[in-house]
Structure formats: structure tokens, C-alpha cells
Regions:
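S-adenosyl-L-methionine
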Residues: 1-27, 32, 37-38, 42
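Hydrophobic "anchor" residues on beta-strands that sit immediately upstream
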Residues: 26, 47, 289
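Class I S-adenosyl-L-methionine-dependent methyltransferase module
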Residues: 46-265
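Mobile active-site "lid"/loop adjacent to the S-adenosyl-L-methionine
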Residues: 229-231, 235-248, 295-315
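Conserved acidic residues
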Residues: 274
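Short amphipathic alpha-helix with an adjacent loop that forms part of the alpha/beta core around
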Residues: 279-285
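Long, positively charged, glycine-interspersed low-complexity recognition regions
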Residues: 291, 297-381
């Protein structure tokens, strides 16, 4: 079973390094859950999971309860994302013709903007038919983002053609134009996401389930599952690009509420606490197994702008020094982390290399050494 949500730092690829160590257990415990790759791979019969992210834990809680309002809200995203195809198809020939004139310098960028605006306005009746303003919250704002992103994409297409000294193929033209439309759709709902996290404007119009559906949509379609915020506290990762245009969003949603997922969460307790509060409360014992994937030793702030400092690393280490439960910790190898765990009785450290596809706010170097820190000698303990 794969993770349900795109989340940075997932450990699905690391499973091969720890498979031989994971013991049979009464309870599976994970204090830094995130996307939960190991949990979903193992599918434990009894689990306790925790994460400090309120948005993430609320998302899992809604799935666990098979919440109908959340299911409807997230299905609305899929419906409107699919409906966007009809709008694109209706206007594509006009947009393509306009771009063909723009690429040979028939008119300026300002005239391009006006021409695109006229084309979009010609599809107003279809637009208002396809997009329910109760869902979009503002069709005018959605159309504005589509216009701006489409004009920007057409401009970058021309720059690319000039740089490569060749024209894009018909397929590439269509893919790029579609990306302009879909990027505008994404940006509109990213704006709403920022209203939610900063408690502005549209946030007050949405129920909790609708906010969580927005959160899931943004996680699914932002570039590389990354998190990044500007100085105003606004999430600013762009749309994922051409490769995201044809993602099967309905299949993703169907999987969220599949019988296997519902059954797995039926046997799972979900918490939203500081990791040490969580571990102290549940009292892991010798029949339990703890998998830990904490933030790394770096200048890292978590995905809701909370820091995980060296004092937090020390709090974690102090707990693990005397843990009676079996545990596996995966973390970036730094002198500080090595010093924390070196020479401790019954704790051993194993090395492996990891290459990251994306870099998330200083968390991930492209090529780094990682440590497996554990009190397990082999699968039998």
C-alpha cells in the first residue's frame, strides 16, 4: 500500500535498508508520521501514529472516520479539475492561433494579454456553467489566475523557442497551453490555501472538511511535494507542470476511502502532539516497535514553520537511550547526531547513502550519508 498524500522526506525507498531489522510487535508506533510510507508498507494490525502538523493529522482523522463531507469536498476538486478539460478544449484553437501570431512577432506582449483576455471572455457562459462559484468562491478570481498564468506560459514558450531556435511540436504546444490553464486553476486554490493558513478572506467561508480537501489538492499538485513559504508566511510552491496535467486524481481519491485503507485506520490511533508528549503518554514497552523519521540536524523549520532544534534532537535521544521498545531511527549523518548516539549501550549505527530528487528548504542535500540508529541486532532482537 502506498502513502495517501505527497509529503517530503518519505522513507519508502529506505525500506530495503531496514526490512531485515523490523521485528514482530504488539504495537507499531510512529511519532513523526508525515506520509507514513513504512506504516502503509507494513500495514500493522495495531498502530499508534503521531505528527505535529495539525493539517496532516486532521486529514488522516477525516479518512479514518470515513467523513462524508470531506469525501464530497475532495470530489468537488476532482470534478472541477476534470471539467477544466472541456474549457481548455473549447478555447484551444483560438489560443493556439493567437500564440502562432505572437511567436513571429506579429504583436507585443501587451497585445497578447489583451487577446487572451478577449478569448477567455468569449467562453464566459461555458466557464460559469462548468465552475460552481460555491466551490471556487470567486469565478472572477479564478479566471484572473487562469489569464495571468496562461499569458505567462505563452511568454515562456516563446522564450524557449527563441533559445532553442526551433518551434515546439504540436503536442508540446498543446501540453504547454494546457499547463497554463491548469497552473491558473492551481494558483487560485493556492491563494485560498494561503487564506486558510493565514486566516484571511476566503478562510471564513469554508468548513473544516473543505479546508482539508484544499490542503490535499495543493499537496497533490504542488511541484515535487515541496514546502516553502515567503516572508509573509505564504506557501509559494508552483504548480507541478506538464507531468501533472494527466494525473488520475479520481483514482487517488478512490484509494483514500478504499476498504483496505479504512480497515488499516480502524486499527490505528491518531495523535497530534509533540513527539515526546506522545511517547510519554503511550508508554512503549518491550513488545512494541517504534519507527522514527524526525527532522534532520539542520537549520530546518517544519512544514508549518515550527523549528526542530538541537535541543529537540537531544530530547529524542534521551528518550531512546533508555527505551525498552525496539526502535529504528533514520536520520542524516552529521557530527552532532553521531556524537549524540555514539558509545551508547545497546545502540548501534549503520550507514547508507541517499540521493534526493528535491531539496526542501535545506533539509535535503542532493547526496548525503544517512544513519540507521537502532537497538535491534537482528529481526529477532
Amino acid at each position: 500500500m502506498n502513502p495517501l498524500i505527497k509529503w517530503p522526506g518519505g522513507k519508502r525507498r529506505e525500506y530495503k535498508y531496514i526490512d531485515s531489522l523490523i521485528p514482530a510487535c504488539t504495537r507499531y508506533i510512529e511519532p513523526f508520521f508525515g506520509g507514513g510510507a513504512i506504516f502503509f508498507h507494513l500495514r500493522p494490525s495495531c498502530a499508534l501514529i503521531n505528527d505535529i502538523s495539525q493539517d496532516l493529522i486532521y486529514f488522516y482523522t477525516l479518512i479514518k472516520s470515513d467523513n462524508k463531507d470531506f469525501k464530497k469536498a475532495i470530489s468537488d476538486y476532482e470534478h472541477h479539475w476534470t471539467s477544466l478539460s472541456g474549457y481548455i478544449n473549447f478555447l484551444y484553437d483560438k489560443i493556439q492561433k493567437t500564440y502562432m501570431e505572437y511567436r513571429i512577432n506579429t504583436f507585443s506582449k501587451n497585445i497578447l494579454t489583451a487577446a487572451v483576455n478577449d478569448i477567455l471572455n468569449s467562453g464566459t457562459d461555458l466557464f460559469n456553467k462548468l465552475f460552481d462559484e460555491k466551490f471556487t468562491l470567486s469565478n472572477g478570481e479564478l479566471l484572473k489566475e487562469i489569464r495571468e498564468n496562461l499569458v505567462d506560459k505563452l511568454g515562456r514558450m516563446k522564450e524557449l523557442e527563441i533559445k532553442s531556435q526551433s518551434y515546439l511540436s504540436e503536442k508540446d504546444l498543446r501540453d504547454n497551453i494546457e499547463t497554463g490553464f491548469r497552473s491558473g486553476f492551481y494558483m487560485h486554490f493556492r491563494n485560498i490555501y494561503n487564506d486558510i493558513i493565514l486566516n484571511r478572506n476566503h478562510s471564513k467561508k469554508l468548513a473544516g472538511e473543505e479546508k482539508s480537501a484544499n490542503f490535499y489538492f495543493i499537496r497533490e499538485y504542488c511541484y515535487g511535494s515541496m514546502f516553502r513559504y515567503n516572508s509573509k508566511g505564504e506557501f509559494n510552491i508552483p504548480y507541478g507542470g506538464i507531468a501533472y496535467n494527466k494525473k488520475n486524481f479520481k483514482r487517488k481519491i478512490d484509494n483514500l476511502f478504499s476498504p483496505d485503507v479504512i480497515e488499516l485506520f480502524r486499527n490505528t490511533e491518531i495523535y497530534n502532539l509533540d513527539f515526546l508528549e506522545f511517547l510519554t503518554m503511550i508508554k512503549p514497552g518491550k513488545e512494541d516497535f517504534i519507527f522514527l523519521d524526525p527532522p534532520y540536524d539542520s537549520d530546518f523549520s517544519d512544514y508549518e514553520s515550527r523549528s526542530f532544534s538541537r535541543s529537540d534532537q537531544e530530547r529524542l535521544a534521551e528518550f531512546l537511550y533508555t527505551a525498552s521498545a525496539k526502535f529504528i531511527l533514520i536520520i542524516k549523518d552529521t557530527p552532532f547526531i553521531s556524537d549524540l548516539y555514539s558509545g551508547k549501550k545497546a545502540i548501534r549505527m549503520l550507514n547508507f547513502d541517499k540521493q534526493y530528487t528535491y531539496n526542501v528548504r535545506g533539509r535535503n542535500d542532493r547526496d548525503v550519508n544517512h544513519l540507521i540508529i537502532t537497538n535491534i541486532l537482528n529481526r529477532d532482537g
